[in-house]
Amino acid sequence: MAFDLSMPILVVDDYNTMIRIIRNLLKQIGFENVDDASDGSAALAKMQGKKYGLVISDWNMEPMTGYDLLREVRASPELSQTPFIMITAESKTENVIAAKKAGVNNYIVKPFNAATLKTKMEAVFGSAA
């Protein structure tokens, strides 16, 4: 199953610069329908009103971390099937394992580029058409 370039994507990060970088990388891949949120709580609020094809979230945010957002998404019957990629500087093995156990679909350690992001997305959705 290939990913749909028109699917809405939610980028969650507390740094506007990182949101812009991820938006630009997604645009390089061909995605235009990208929303953003500054933390997990704001992301959950947006997810209540719109069905996203993918959530890309940072791990370290306040007041709600990306890890906590992932756990909330997976616990929600309405949201639990939403694909989720964690993008973070947290490369510690225990964090990767915790995210996998919580149900993350893929995990990217910063820094990264468009090719890395696309490869990780293809691993979640299958190769692009």
Please give the residue ranges for each predicted region.
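C-terminal output helix
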Residues: 112-121
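Active-site beta3 strand of CheY-like receiver
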Residues: 51-56
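Alpha4 helix (beta4-alpha4-beta5 surface) of REC/receiver domains from two-component response regulators
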Residues: 23, 68, 91-106
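Receiver (REC) domain active-site loop signature in two-component systems and cognate sites
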Residues: 61
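Helix N-cap/capping motif at the beta->alpha junctions
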Residues: 36-45, 66
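Short amphipathic alpha-helix used as the core "switch/output" element in two-component signaling
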Residues: 45, 67-80
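Two-component/phosphorelay signaling modules centered on CheY-like receiver
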Residues: 16-35
